Structure formats: C-alpha cells, structure tokens
Amino acid sequence: MSQLMHFSRRILLATIFIASACLPAAAQTPSPTPSTAPTPPPSDIYIVDLKTKHNYQTHADEMRLGDPKRITDFAGYNNQPYFMPDGKSILYTSIRDKQADIYRYDIETGATTRVTNTPESEYSPTLMPDRKNISVVRVESDGTQRLWKFPLDGGPPSLIVEEIKPVGYHLWIDDHTLALFILGASGKPNFLELYDLHTRKSEFITDNPGRVLRRIPNQEKFSFVQKIAPDRWEIKAFDLRTRTSASLISALPGVEDYAWLPGGILLMGKESKLFAVAPLQGKSWSQLEDFTVPGLQGISRIAVSPKGDRLAIVARPSQ
C-alpha cells in the first residue's frame, strides 16, 4: 500500500547528489556546495541510427544499428541526453568551468547551443508537458537541490515545487503529476514518490530506486529499477491506475540505466555492449551490439528518439 505525505522524510541536506553516469551504478557524488563540488568523471554522448525490419520494434533480432557518432567535443562531463519531440535535437548536461549547464545539439546541422547560463548548476533537462518550458534539477547557491523550469523562449527561470528537496531525478507523468527520486536524509535510503502539483500531496512508492524513471510505451505505467539487494536489481513497473508495482525483469548485473523503444523493447548497456529484451514476451537479455569505436566504453545512460529510429548513448572516453 502507498503511504501518503512523507514530508517528514524531506530535509535540507548539507550534501547533495550530482548525477554521474560514469561512476559505478550505485555510486552517488556528494557536493556540499557548488564551489566545492568534485567534478564527475568525463563522459561523451554518441548518437546511433536504429533500423528495424518492416519498421517493427518488437523483436530485438530484427534490429540493426548504424555507426556511432560522437556529438560532444568538450573534454569533460557530457551526460543526461534527452531527445526533443521532433527528434531533431538533443538536450544534455555539460560541466564547463566547474558549472553544469544545459546545451542543445542540432542533429541535422551538428551545431551546439547553450540553453542555460547561470551561476548555479542545472541537470536532467526534460521538456515539460506544456512544451514551452524545460524542467531541470537545479543546484542552488546554498546547495539546495530542487526542481526548476526554464522557458524555451529565454525568459527567467522559476521554481516548480518549493517544498520538495533534495530532488535527484524526475519524470513528468502528466501536466500536474511528477515521479520524483528524492535523496534520503543522512543514513536513510533514497526513495521514490509521486507528487501532485494540484493537491500538493505526495505518495510514497518505494525505497532504493534507481536513477532512471521512464514511461512504459502504450501503457498507464512507468518503470524504475528497484535495488532490492547489492546483487539483485529488478526493473519494475508502477501501475498508475492500481497504484501497485510489479517486477518486469532482472537488470543486468550492476546496471541501472535503461531505455524503452516505442515497441516495448528494453535496452541496457554494459561496457561496450548494448543489450535488448522484450520483457512482456517473457524473454531474456540478448546482445544487440558490441561497439568497436575507440573511446566508446563504459556505456551508461541511453535515450531513444520519439520514433525509435535513433539512440543517444553515454559512454566513458578512453583514458
């Protein structure tokens, strides 16, 4: 059963969480203040074309991947890719001059533009349901970590939810409902909750979630990784109608980053390999590709274009 109003679990932490796909999957990077925050390990973003037989995306053995193309030329942290609805550009986080800002890459022209340029740090860019703003996890000047929005037309940013902190990651369910990864207090586990912007009420879902929250294609559900034990991580589905969770499939060992294709296939990466599975068909993970591109190793985050014809893959560059 869900537990409502877990406001007692939220406090302003002196340490905050910065997302780093290049750390071990369970790791978190504390940063007492933006000025003293350690820089996450470097990472690059690649885009890869995805083709399927007869345009179906329900069978992994019918998929073919093109050659990866690196879209980030800045040596440092380039992470958290997010495809815009038209599939023509990608938002991502990049740390430059010790500050994390949001950038936008145009796939057709290859041009990169800066979206945010603030003294604070912004992470996890996501287009809001109104399609006029992007929401971000913002590390404020005092280290507070909350959800903000930036207008796409360049207007001033504003808080989305004042009282919820510290936010690690988020997913828009609809125009007034959010799934939120909340950092636990000292000695307490991180937890996952739903938050209603209209009622200002929270609904507790589970402890120890993974950082990736995704809508499941063509279902009234969203997915998350449940870290049940150090050696047992499962991808679960939360049913928005029944308010219950059910296991879909075990995650690859030590991996918490994943993505859905529109046809219902799950993707996960490990080292230089990309794996796929159709969990609703009761199948197991199979290797889809082993990339041989120099520098493409340590795959972590994966994003899928709206049509499912292109992937954005985060990888660790060669040392």
Where would I find each of the regions flagged by the language model?
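Bacterial N-terminal signal peptides that target proteins for export
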Residues: 2-13
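Bacterial N-terminal signal peptides
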Residues: 12-22
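Sec/Tat signal peptide C-region and signal peptidase I cleavage site
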Residues: 23-27
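Sequence signature of WD/YWTD-type beta-propeller architectures
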Residues: 28-319
